[in-house]
Amino acid sequence: MPKVVFHYFGAKGWARPTMLLAYGGQEFEDHRVEYEQWPEFKPNTPFGQMPVLEIDGKKYAQSLAISRYLGRKYGLAGNDIEEDFEIDQIVDFVNDIRASAASVEYEQDAANKEVKHEENMKNKYPFQLNKLSEIITKNNGFLALGRLTWADFVFVGMFDYLKKMLRMPDLEEQYPIFKKPIETVLSNPKLKAYLDSAPKKEF
């Protein structure tokens, strides 16, 4: 079995590829870098970003690329390129929602931030979230293919961050179907030991 190290800051973050490692039964070192250590660690990463997945000494980066790789490795990808296409498009769509909300929340001008947030609450988020709800409903509580895929792990890993960026602490109450993939992933017995020991600090 390869030596695997997952490098990230001392928080849950989003996407959480570690859940996929746990699902795959992969033993790994969960290396947490404190923020004061980051300037020293940063030059040793592929792109100066976190997270980093290290396999037998070689380092790889980008949350979604890592998740896609692990999904393929552990049987959570499509059975052909069209099924992979379906998974990729929904992952990109969920990430678009995250990115659009985050761009507003990280706006430095407070007044402009509120204007953009109100605009998105009126014109963007309802369409995006309703569409996502429709897709999960169509897929019987999963994000793609009507079965468990790595897209579900990305969605669940991102969900708390998404609620924060959208300013919707009751997001799963507004869209109850969102609870389905969350319950499916978090109740998986393969993840229990990892989830019990995983960082609780959010971001």
From Swiss-Prot:
Chain positions recorded as glutathione binding sites: 8, 38, 42, 48-50, 62-63
GST C-terminal domain segment(s): 80-203
UniProt induction comment: By dietary chemicals.
Superkingdom of origin organism: Eukaryota
Protein name: Glutathione S-transferase 2
Quaternary structure, from the entry: Homodimer.
EC numbers for this chain: 2.5.1.18
UniProtKB keywords: Transferase
Gene3D superfamilies cross-referenced by the UniProt entry: 1.20.1050.10, Glutaredoxin
Reaction catalyzed: RX + glutathione = an S-substituted glutathione + a halide anion + H(+)
PROSITE patterns per the UniProt record, alphabetical: GST_CTER, GST_NTER
Biological source species: Manduca sexta
Name of encoding gene: GST2
Keyword check for Glycoprotein: no
Pfam families xrefs: GST_C_3 (PF14497), GST_N (PF02798)
GST N-terminal domain: residues covered: 1-78
Family of the protein in this entry: Belongs to the GST superfamily. Sigma family.
InterPro entries: Glutathione-S-Trfase_C-like, Glutathione-S-Trfase_C_sf, Glutathione_S-Trfase_N, GST_C, GST_superfamily, Thioredoxin-like_sf
GO biological process, any: glutathione metabolic process
SUPFAM superfamilies documented for this protein: GST C-terminal domain-like, Thioredoxin-like
GO molecular function term, any single one: glutathione transferase activity
Biological role: Conjugation of reduced glutathione to a wide number of exogenous and endogenous hydrophobic electrophiles.
